[in-house]
Design a protein with these regions (language model features):
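Extended terminal accessory/targeting regions
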Residues: 1-116
Length: 116
């Protein structure tokens, strides 16, 4: 199904939400550290990402999917939570759906690695 050299095409919706996240961060001055900003830049400017970035995105959503969306001001564009800005920077809801698809592919690759 793939290996660590594979590239994963970034969907248009992910790019759009990543741009919204960048704009929110610029407007409010908070949300997202160095890693989030680096991934956001890749999501906005590259047509695809590599294995390491795919793993980082999947890890982010696994860690944040249960805590960020129910938090206060999540989804509020005028006074957004830090979690909302980071969520958008990582591709938003489109990125979350995409990460679920990527997760299946990554799980297969990681399983193959363990069997070697």
């Amino acid at each position: 199904m793939g290996d660590k050299r594979d590239r994963y095409r970034i969907p248009r919706g992910v790019k759009k939400e990543a741009l919204q996240g960048k704009d929110l961060r610029a407007m409010h001055g908070y949300g997202g550290g160095k890693v989030t900003k680096a991934i956001n830049k890749k999501l906005r400017y590259q047509k695809d990402i590599g294995y390491k970035t795919a793993v980082s995105i999947d890890t982010y959503y696994r860690r944040h999917e249960k805590v960020d969306p129910p938090a206060k001001n999540f989804g509020d564009r005028k006074n957004p939570s830090k979690g909302y800005i980071m969520w958008k920077m990582m591709g938003g809801d489109s990125g979350h759906r995409w990460s679920r698809q990527l997760q299946k592919t990554l799980d297969v690759i990681q399983k193959k690695e363990r069997l070697k």
